[in-house]
Amino acid sequence: MGQKINPLGFRLGTTQGHHSLWFSQPKNYSEGLQEDKKIRDCIKNYVQKNMRTSSGIEGIARIEIQKRIDLIQVIIFMGFPKLLIESRPRGIEELQMTLQKEFNCVNRKLNIAVTRIAKPYGNPNILAEFIAGQLKNRVSFRKAMKKAIELTEQADTKGIQIQIAGRIDGKEIARVEWIREGRVPLQTIRAKIDYCSYTVRTIYGILGIKIWIFLDEE
């Protein structure tokens, strides 16, 4: 069996950058890591509660955190920031206040910026949310996969692979189904590949969705 490494960690420092940029003393490192996790969870929960979308897509591609001695800079990359801003005009300020209360930033300023990504459906996280929404609405998994591939074709990607594992369509025996369109060279380090794994709770149990998108070759 081929051992499958996480494509993002495999390419760190070449085509993939870090999502958290900060340094700390070894003894404080675990605290910083937990703080990052809490910040990301808090933002995701807030967006989930306050974003009114029919499709159920939150549209968060990634959250980057940069820390300095007196400042925590959080950049949220979203596919559809308009929806959040329209449903809550002061949403960003509210989110900032919530985070400041949560982490009692007395001596550190917290700053949040929202950036729109150009091609939302070229991002695996947003696609995974789309597929999850379809599966929750009991759309057949093949139909959901094909629709997702159609959406990525509009985003000028060079290849995509989608894998769904679990009790698909409520069958008694769990299985793995996958589909690939175009090229996905996982062994090539200079190939810019975006990856995401996402769990979705359906009435039959939990399904795992994995998406690899081949964006470009450097």
From Swiss-Prot:
Pfam families: Ribosomal_S3_C. The keyword Glycoprotein does not apply. It is found in: Plastid, Chloroplast. One of its GO terms (cellular component) is chloroplast. Keywords: Chloroplast, Plastid, Ribonucleoprotein, Ribosomal protein, RNA-binding, rRNA-binding. Residues 47-118 form the KH type-2 domain. It comes from the Eukaryota. GO terms for molecular function: rRNA binding; structural constituent of ribosome. GO terms for biological process: translation. Its main location: plastid. PANTHER family: 30S/40S RIBOSOMAL PROTEIN S3, SMALL RIBOSOMAL SUBUNIT PROTEIN US3C. Belongs to the universal ribosomal protein uS3 family. Part of the 30S ribosomal subunit. This is Small ribosomal subunit protein uS3c. The gene is rps3.
